[in-house]
Amino acid sequence: MTSTSARPARRSRAPLAITAAIIAALVIAFFIFAGFYADVLWYDQLGYLGVLLTQWGAGIALFLVGFLAMAIPVFVSIQVAYRSRPVYAKLNSQLDRYQQVVEPLRRLAMFAIPAVFGLFAGVSASSGWQRTLLWLNRTPSGTVDPQFQLDTSFYMFELPFYHAVVGFASAVVIISMLGVLATSYLYGAVRFTGREVRISKSSRIQIAITAGVYFLLQGVSIWLDQYSSVVNNANGGLFTGAAYSDVNAVIPGRAILAGIAGVVALFFIVTAVIGRWRLPIIGTAGLIVASILVGTAYPAIVQRFQVEPNERALESQYYERNIEATRQAYGLADIEEIPYDATTDTTPGALREDAATTANIRILDPAVVGDAFSQLQQFRQYYQFGDNLDVDRYQIDGRVQDTVVAVRELSPTNTGTSWVNQHLVYTHGYSLVAAYGTQRTSDGQPVFLESGIPASGDLGDFEPRVYFGENSPDYSIVGGPESGDKVELDYPSGVDGADETYTTFQGDGGPKVDNVFKRLIYALKFQSEQIFLANQINDQSQIIYDRDPAERVGKVAPYLTIDKDPYPSVVDGRVVWIVDGYTTSDQYPYSQRQDMSRLIADSQQTQPLVPTDQINYIRNSVKATVDAYDGKVTLYAWDTDDPILKTWQKVFPSTLKPISDISGELMSHLRFPADMFKVQRAVLGKYHVTDPGSIYSNQDLWTTPNDPTATTEAGTPASLQPPYYLTMQMPGQDAPRFSLYSTFIPPATQDTSRSVLTGYLGVDSDAGSTAGEKAADYGKLRLLTLPNDDTIPAPTQIQNNFNSDTNVANQLNLLERGGRTSVVRGNLLTLPVGGGLLYVQPVYVRSTGDTSYPLLRKVLVAFGDKIAFEDTLDAALDSIFEGDSGATAGDEDVVPTTPVDGGTGDGATDGATDGGTGSTPTPAPTTSPSAPAQDVQAALDAANTALQERQAAYASGDLVAAAQADQRFTEAVQRAYELSQQQ
C-alpha cells in the first residue's frame, strides 16, 4: 500500500523538477544576455560598436569553424568505424560486457562525443580571433629577413596562423584516430589474439588513411619549423634568431625530416590499398631514428665540434643579424651617439651657455608633492589626488613652462555609505590643478598656476568637471531634465566652502537607462536592485562606467598594449586624458625577445611575479585621448609606417583618425611615452654596441642604476631609477627641448660594483605645436657615451656623497628637529650642462602628523666632487661654481622663510578658494594640542543632528538635503575623531 502511494508522488515531482530546471536555465541565460547587451549599449554609445561586432563576428565564425572542423571528422570517423564493423565478430566476455553497457547509449554517444570535443575546439579556435584577422588583413612591411629573404610580415602575421592551423588539424586527426580505435576495438574490428593484432579490412583502410593524414600534417609542421628558427631563441637563449648550427644543421635537417614524414604518409596510404603494415612501420621507425640523428644529434655535433672551438668567428654574422634586427625592431636604428668627455671642473660662469636649461630645471618632484596637493587643494574628504602626479608643460606669458599636474578626483571611500550618495550624488571630480615645476613659495609650497574651486589661473576657461578618471567610482547614474532638481554634488562653495553647488550632467557620456528593460539589464550587470527600483532615475538618465582612461582605450582598441601612465591636460577648453598605445609582436625575425613588464618595472612601477608579455618588436603607434567630462575616446594613428597598425586599420576601419586631425594645442601636450623609453633603454644596455664580438662576449654591458631615493624591504631587489621629463638642451640640439632621459652604469658582478656613469640617454619628447604635424626631431634618441677611463659618479654614488657629507648631515639633523619631522629626498636629476654632469635633488621636510605635507626646504647640487646644499637651486648653483654659475634657476626670486612651526606642512585646508596664478590657499588652523572634552562632545552632537536630518530628508525624498546632511555628518565624525586623538 505504501509503495503504491509513493509512485504517483514521485511522478508528480518530475514535472516540477523539469520546470525548475527550465526556469533556472532561462535565468542564467538572461544573466548572460544582460552582460552581452550591456556591452552593446556601451560600445554603441561610444561610437565603437563596430569594434565589438567585429570581435564577436570573428569569434563566432571561428567557433563555428572550430566546432565543425572537430565535430564532423570525429563523428564521421566513429560512424564509419561502427558501420564497417564485422557482423559476426568473435568477442571475448569482457567486450561483450562493454557492449551491453555501451549499446543503450550508443546513439547518444555518437553525437555527444563529437559535440563535446567540438565545443572545446570551438572555444580554442575563437580565442585566436586576433591571429586570424591579422592573417586575413596582413600588410607587408617592406623589410626582409636575412635568412629566407621573406618579408617580416610573414613571421608576424602568417607563420603563427599556419602553425595554429596545423596544430588544430593534428588535434582533430588524433582525436578522430582515438575514436576509430575505440570503436573498432569495441565492435571487434581490431582484436588482440595472443601476440597478434587482427584488423579488419575496412578498419585497416580507415586507420591507415587517418595515420597518413597525421604524418602529412607533421611533415608540414616540421617544414614550418624551419622558418620558426629565425624567431626562436638560439644558443641556449643567448640571442634570438638562427645561429650557425641552426642554419647549417637544424634548418636543412628539418627539410629532410619533413620529406621523410611525407614519405611515411605515402606508405600509410599504400597500406590502405595493399594491406601490409611493413612499409609504414619501417617508415615510422626511420622517421624516429632520423629525428634523433638529423634533428638532434647532428646539430649537437656541429655545435660541439665545429662551432664551440671557433664560436666567435662562426657566429659573428648571426650576432650581426641579431644586432641589426633588434635595433630596428625596438626603434633604435637611428640613434645618434655623441662622445661626451665630461669635465669635473667648476669654474665661474660655467653654466652661462646652459642658462636656458638651468632656468627649466624642475625642483618639484611629482612623486613627492602629492600630499602637498592634497592638503592645499583637496578641500573636502570626498576629493583626492594620486600619489604620483604627472609632468606636463603649458605656454604661460609666451614661455613654455614645465608643470606638475593632477586631477582632483572623487575618493569613492569617502562619499558615504548610501547607494544614493555613491552613485547619484557624488558623481564626478572637479578640475585640474597645476603647479610650476621650477618654482616654490618662500615657505616651500608649490606655486600653483591653476588651482582652487571654482578653478582659476593661467589655463583659461575650460570644462572642469571630471566624470572619467583613474579613480572614478565603478558607476554613476547622471543626467536629467535641465528644469529638474539637480542632485549631483558639483563643488563646495560659499564662505569657507560651507555650502555646496549642485549640477546635472549635460553630455553624452554613457548608455541611457530610459526604460525598465535597460534598468533591469544594468541592475543585473552591477548586481544592484537599486538601479531597477530607484525613482530618482528618469528617462534622460545615463549610466557611466568603465571610467578609467586606459581601460576605455583598451576596450575600443583591443590590439594595443596600453601605457601605464595616462596623464591629464587642458586641451581646447576640455580636460582630457592622453593615453599612449603600443603595437607589439614577439615574432620579428632575429630581434631579441624581452619581457616587457620586466623592462618597464622601476621604483614607481612594480614587476609581476610571472611576466607573460614577451615582445621583440614595439612601436608607439597610437595616441589616444579620453575626454574627462563625457568619456569620448579618440584614437590617432601616430606611427603610419607600422605594418601592424596598418593591418589593424583594415580590420577596424574608420576607428583611427589621421595625424592631420590633431589640433595644435593637443600636439603641444603629446610627449614621448615613458614605457616605450624604458623598453628602449633596457635593450640599449646591451645593444648600444654594434660589434658582434662585444655582444658575444658581453664585454660592454650597461644597466640602469637603482633609484637612490627608493627604500626596499630586506630580501627585496632594488628598484631601478625611473626616467625623468625635463626641458633641457642636450649636445646636438640647438635649443632646449622637453625631453625624457635616463643614465647607464656598468652592471654589478659578484666581485665588483662600479657606480660610475657610462652613458646618458635622452629622447626629444616635444611633438611641437603645429596642428596635424609632429616636430621633425620628435622621438630622436641621443646617447652620450662617456670614456671608459672616466670616473664620473653615478646617481647612487652621488646620493652616497650627499649622505656622507658632514655639512649636509648636520643641516639634515637640524631639519629633522629631533625626530619631530622627517626629511624626504626628491628625485635625483642628472643634466649634461657646463661640459659635465650636474646633479640636482630637492629636499623636503614634513612633520609626523597625519595631516602634514612635504615642504621644499633645501636643494642639493653636485658637480664633479663638489657638493652644495642651499635653500634654493639658484643659490646652490652659484655655490658650486665659485659664487657665479653664469645662469639662473627658476627659484631665483625666492626668499626662504622659516615659519614658527618649522615649516613642516602641518594642517589641511578644508574650504574652497579662488586660487589663481601663484596663489596658495592658507591651511586651516591646527587645533590645540589638548582639545577640551566639550569640543569632542559638540562634534558628536553635530554628527547625531546631521544623521537625523539625513534620515528625515530620505524619508521625504529630498536628495539634495540628504546629501548635504550626509556631508555634515561625515565632517562632524571626522572632526570628533581628530579632536579625540589630541586629548
Curated annotation (Swiss-Prot):
Q: Where in the cell is it found?
A: Cell membrane
What InterPro entries is this protein classified in? UPF0182
- What are the alphabetically sorted keywords of the record? Cell membrane, Membrane, Transmembrane, Transmembrane helix
Ranges for region Disordered: 699-718, 884-936
Please give the start and end residues of each transmembrane region: 16-36, 56-76, 108-128, 161-181, 205-225, 255-275, 281-301
Residue spans with biased composition (Polar residues)? 699-714
Which spans does this entry mark as compositional bias, Gly residues?
902-918
Q: What is its main location?
A: membrane
Q: Where is the composition biased (Low complexity)?
A: 919-933
The entry's cellular-component GO terms read: extracellular region; plasma membrane
Q: How does it sit in the membrane?
A: Multi-pass membrane protein
Q: Which family does it belong to?
A: Belongs to the UPF0182 family.
| Name of this protein | UPF0182 protein CMM_1204
